[in-house]
Amino acid sequence: MIRSNKPPENSCLLYNKGLMPYLEAHAWQRSLLHQRIDYPNLEDVLILLEHPPVYTLGQGSSLEFLKFDPNQSEFEIHRIERGGEVTYHCPGQLVGYPILNLRRHRQDLHWYLRQLEEVIIRVLAVYGLKGDRLPSLTGVWLEGRKVAAIGIKVSRWITMHGFALNVCPDMTGFGRIVPCGITDKPVGSLAQWIPGITCEEVRVHVVQAFAEVFGLVLVES
């Protein structure tokens, strides 16, 4: 019997990383994206990691949602190509960067955003928590508090950026911004409902939910 070394179409490389500087992860994403633009048959990728404290602004983000002067700031801040307003990353927040070829899934950005929300909702359900979507907003809420932010960039139907789930972060950094430009809804973290929860245990459930929602077989790399 002749066996093919070609991976199945629904395989997805999983990179489980620890704490990674934002710009390093951003450059890595861009490299993976451009590889897949040039070679569309390459496998999908999911990167899971945490970042040191950093603020990021979407390409059209307004500076009015910063409560500090970005030109005279001790805080790391970057404007990037994703959609959405300002957000905050820090240890204790689990960040997922899917690099997916949507031609293999569905060429529909609204569908993709809802699928990312569904991943988070399924993770929360593992803990008996009901994650909510809100009309006209992107992300996932728990009892009125936003626990997951989502922002994406898609080039030639290849995705980058992704989701950030507040597991057990120090929430202080969120107080320096209006997260995602939403003035009337607070942010929250899973630790407020589940004391002692860690990113390490949540990773397992994120991987399982991501595989189920997107119909992928994740292979740790």
Swiss-Prot record:
Source superkingdom: Bacteria
Protein residues bound to substrate: 82-89, 149-151, 162-164
Site feature location: Lowers pKa of active site Cys: 146
Alphabetically ordered keywords of this record: Acyltransferase, Cytoplasm, Transferase
CDD domains listed in its UniProt record: LipB
Reaction catalysed by this enzyme: octanoyl-[ACP] + L-lysyl-[protein] = N(6)-octanoyl-L-lysyl-[protein] + holo-[ACP] + H(+)
InterPro entries according to UniProt: aa-tRNA-synth_II/BPL/LPL, BPL_LPL_catalytic, Octanoyltransferase, Octanoyltransferase_CS
Function: Catalyzes the transfer of endogenously produced octanoic acid from octanoyl-acyl-carrier-protein onto the lipoyl domains of lipoate-dependent enzymes. Lipoyl-ACP can also act as a substrate although octanoyl-ACP is likely to be the physiological substrate.
Additional record remark: In the reaction, the free carboxyl group of octanoic acid is attached via an amide linkage to the epsilon-amino group of a specific lysine residue of lipoyl domains of lipoate-dependent enzymes.
Name of the molecule in the record: Octanoyltransferase
Organism, scientific name: Trichormus variabilis (strain ATCC 29413 / PCC 7937)
Lineage: Bacteria, Bacillati, Cyanobacteriota, Cyanophyceae, Nostocales
Gene that encodes the chain: lipB
